[in-house]
């Protein structure tokens, strides 16, 4: 998320203490039913930060009962004024601002995110998104409809009910807010399962949710693993909607489970292999910088990463040269330290997967311009890597890498690059760089992607809908459309004695 004026970045909080490691149900802290816990790892040091209660189906069942009770007709939550729901969300945003330093430090420590980025963009984006949803709370309404006959007809936008929300590890706090903000603003109750790698900011948020004054059972947070806690949410017969951000592979399983259970509503924000097209008439400095930012931001762990870079033939060599020069300027290290540009990957599994894909690029004939291996001997660090002479059939050009790896491909014509850009099962995002307005509009209209950035990249804001085409997901988050994803539309028709226009 971007802002014209950013606050000064303080030093990270020293001597961070982990306060919350239990399951949060009914505004109270609980041990897991099984008694199990799981370790949370600092990816920069490979050391255990703490152990967290491991929720599974039994804990999800408890959370669903609490959420269903809170959603009962006549409950404090159901009878609360919509404007009061908005006030609670505004209050939560204020508490996040108060504890911004702690949350940013926790996010950087647990998720390997560069602290300055966490403080400015993650926390800044969270607070803006929460306030946006708060403002919508008393503006979600129906319409009156001039139906035929002596009938008075109107529509109602009603909350769906109990919503299961499964959060990824790459933007744990931001995705937490993207999920709960619209759900609560519309009057739903929620069960949140944070990623097992990054549960700590979600659990801290539970304490702020209670402090803000949300009634018991409205928000419940159950840390645990996908195949147990996540699967229990997807297949639960008393959950009305599931929202998931993560891989396409898991998204398919969630949609299948939703269909086999109670046909719950589903919102999915899944993987991507997003094309970024640079035409010869583009501002080269701008294009190089945004293309770099688009794939290297947060160690490449972004679903919208500009991971298929198409550069017009006449500027290809110069673009590659500048891109390599830019990548070599990166400083790797502990994300809490000042002057660091790149932190670690989230865990060993992701780290090893990235290195495997880098090796495939070397073997399949791409030219390794820089990087290409592990960095350091502690932590899950990968060198910033740039490949040139990449062809469309290589694994690095087809598979989602989710790491700091830029692959630069060459194109000759507009028609050719559009076909190549769309030749993927994904359709989350795309970028176009050109000074030609006609070309920009033509290409952005032709690209099969949920969001297209022109002469910029990864510029997100709470007011704009976000989501994917094809196998990059279903539904939208953020914006007016993202709000309505958490409502059911009801038509009410009333017989009257006489209708008058």
From Swiss-Prot:
N-acetylserine: modified positions:
2
Instruction: Work out whether the entry's keyword set contains Disulfide bond.
Output: no
Major localisation: cytoplasm
Location in or out of the cell: Cytoplasm, Cytosol; Cell projection, Axon
Q: Quick one: which residues bind NAD(+)?
A: 167-170, 193-196, 226-227, 246-247, 269-271, 349-353, 400-402
Question: Quick one: which pathway?
Answer: Cofactor metabolism; retinol metabolism
What residues sit in the active site?
Answer: 269 (proton acceptor), 303 (nucleophile)
Q: Which CDD domains match?
A: ALDH_F1AB_F2_RALDH1
Post-translational modification, briefly?
Answer: The N-terminus is blocked most probably by acetylation.
Q: Where is this site: Transition state stabilizer?
A: 170
Q: Identify the stretch annotated as signal peptide in this record.
A: none
Cited InterPro entries: Ald_DH/histidinol_DH (IPR016161), Ald_DH_C (IPR016163), Ald_DH_CS_CYS (IPR016160), Ald_DH_CS_GLU (IPR029510), Ald_DH_N (IPR016162), Aldehyde_DH_dom (IPR015590)
For the modification N6-acetyllysine, which residues carry it? 91, 128, 252, 353, 367, 410, 419, 435, 495
Q: Which named protein is this?
A: Aldehyde dehydrogenase 1A1
The primary gene name is: ALDH1A1
């Amino acid at each position: 998320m971007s802002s014209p004026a950013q606050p000064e970045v303080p030093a990270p909080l020293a001597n961070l203490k982990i306060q919350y490691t239990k399951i949060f149900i009914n505004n109270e802290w609980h041990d897991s039913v099984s008694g199990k816990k799981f370790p949370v790892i600092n990816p920069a040091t490979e050391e255990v930060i703490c152990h967290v209660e491991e929720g599974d189906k039994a804990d999800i069942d408890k959370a669903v009962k609490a959420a269903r009770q809170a959603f009962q007709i006549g409950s404090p939550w159901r009878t609360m004024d919509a404007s009061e729901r908005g006030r609670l969300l505004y209050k939560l945003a204020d508490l996040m601002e108060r504890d911004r330093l702690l949350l940013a430090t926790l996010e950087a420590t647990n998720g390997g995110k560069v602290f300055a980025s966490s403080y400015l963009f993650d926390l800044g984006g969270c607070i803006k998104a929460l306030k946006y949803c708060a403002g919508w709370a008393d503006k979600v309404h129906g319409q009156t409809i001039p139906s035929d006959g002596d009938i008075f007809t109107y529509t109602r936008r009603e909350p769906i009910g109990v919503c299961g929300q499964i959060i990824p590890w790459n933007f744990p706090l931001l995705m937490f807010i993207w999920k709960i903000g619209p759900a609560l603003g519309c009057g739903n109750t929620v069960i949140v399962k944070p990623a097992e790698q990054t549960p700590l900011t979600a659990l801290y948020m539970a304490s702020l949710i209670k402090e803000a004054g949300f009634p018991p059972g409205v928000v419940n947070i159950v840390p645990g693993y996908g195949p147990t806690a996540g699967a229990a949410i997807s297949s639960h017969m008393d959950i009305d909607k599931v929202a998931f951000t993560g891989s396409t592979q898991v998204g398919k399983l969630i949609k299948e489970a939703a269909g086999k259970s109670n046909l719950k509503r589903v919102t999915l924000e899944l993987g991507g292999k997003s094309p970024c097209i640079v035409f010869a008439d583009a501002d080269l400095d701008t294009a190089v910088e945004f293309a770099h930012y688009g794939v290297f931001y947060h160690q490449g762990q972004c679903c919208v990463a500009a991971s298929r870079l198409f550069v017009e033939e006449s500027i290809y060599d110069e673009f590659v040269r500048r891109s390599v020069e830019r990548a070599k300027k990166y400083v790797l290290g502990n994300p809490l330290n000042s002057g660091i540009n790149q932190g670690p990957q989230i865990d060993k599994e992701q780290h090893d997967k990235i290195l495997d894909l880098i090796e495939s690029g070397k073997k399949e004939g791409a030219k390794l311009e820089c990087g290409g291996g592990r960095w350091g001997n502690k932590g899950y660090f990968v060198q910033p890597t740039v490949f040139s002479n990449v062809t469309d059939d290589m694994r690095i050009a087809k598979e989602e890498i989710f790491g700091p790896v830029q692959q630069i491909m060459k194109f000759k014509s507009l028609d050719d690059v559009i076909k190549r850009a769309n030749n993927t099962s994904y359709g989350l995002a795309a970028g176009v760089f050109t000074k030609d307005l006609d070309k920009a509009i033509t290409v952005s209209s032709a690209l099969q992607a949920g969001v297209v950035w022109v002469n910029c990249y990864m510029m997100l804001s709470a007011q704009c809908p976000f989501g994917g085409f094809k196998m990059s997901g279903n539904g939208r988050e953020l914006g007016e459309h993202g709000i309505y994803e958490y409502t059911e539309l009801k038509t009410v028709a009333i017989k009257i004695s006489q209708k008058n226009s």
